[in-house]
A protein has these predicted regions:
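Catalytic cores of the polymerase beta-like nucleotidyltransferase superfamily
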Residues: 1-240
Length: 240
């Protein structure tokens, strides 16, 4: 039976403790007082290579705490690191496991991902592995919807481009839109989620999405409430 707050067991030695960490880049320590680097899993090499790898098998690591899959996407967005293929395969295989994790923990990781320097990387990883089907199913659904008014293969690609453009509007800390702006970035990825539900085909092959903005606003409020965002954030994002 999965716990909503998994308890990770630790080893009897420093090395044993490190092997139970989430990723090798976090599985290093300095032994005092000599400041000797303890790196049983090759974390320093992975740090230099920009690779996210688990100290033990990815399946075992994610079974210990399924939130680590969200953390992989967040670190990819924060650090610009690549995810090792075994890790990505395990994320795909276990994509539904975050359902047993508390909503608050999932939301916290999603927030960290979105305010990272490269949120597009993290979102693409969530969608590619199927994790978005649990966390942001409305985003994943956009892959199946084509909007002929935009120069993208689907609304999903258009949405990620809008996210990039929204980040370009952010300013320094003393400007009108201090970066990173969580509300702006959430609004960017949610702005077209009403299109799949409102898509209609007209004679001649024309596609319309009449009322998608109003439908999308309702869907946004529902999703953000489910993720337990605060009321002000929900209000601001759905208004945008």
């Amino acid at each position: 039976v999965g716990s909503r707050k998994p308890v990770v067991a630790y080893g009897d030695t420093l090395e044993g403790d490190l092997t139970r960490r989430d990723f090798t880049i976090n599985a290093m320590a300095l032994r005092l007082p000599d400041l000797e680097l303890v790196d049983p899993c090759g974390g320093l090499d992975d740090l230099r290579a920009g690779v996210l790898r688990t100290p033990v098998s990815a399946v075992q690591s994610f079974d210990d705490d399924p939130l680590r899959m969200m953390r992989a996407a967040r670190f990819s967005a924060q650090l610009g690191f690549d995810v090792e293929m075994d890790v990505m395969n395990a994320m795909t295989r276990m994509a539904l496991r975050p359902e047993i994790v508390s909503v608050e923990r999932v939301r916290a990781e999603l927030e960290r991902l979105l305010v990272s320097p490269w949120p597009r990387r993290g979102l693409e990883l969530l969608v590619h592995t199927g994790l978005a089907d649990v966390v942001l199913p409305e985003l994943a659904a956009l892959r199946e919807t084509v909007d002929e008014h935009h120069r993208h293969k689907d609304v999903y690609e258009h949405t990620l481009t809008v996210l990039d453009q929204a980040m370009g509007l952010e300013t320094g800390a003393d400007g009108p839109v201090p970066a990173p702006d969580l509300v702006l970035r959430l609004a960017a990825i949610m702005h077209d989620i009403g299109k799949p539900a409102t898509r209609r085909f007209l004679p001649g092959g024309t596609v319309t999405f009449h009322g998608h903005d109003h439908v999308g606003a309702r869907m946004t409020r529902k999703r953000l409430r489910a993720l337990r965002f605060d009321k002000q954030t929900i209000k601001d994002v759905s208004r945008l």
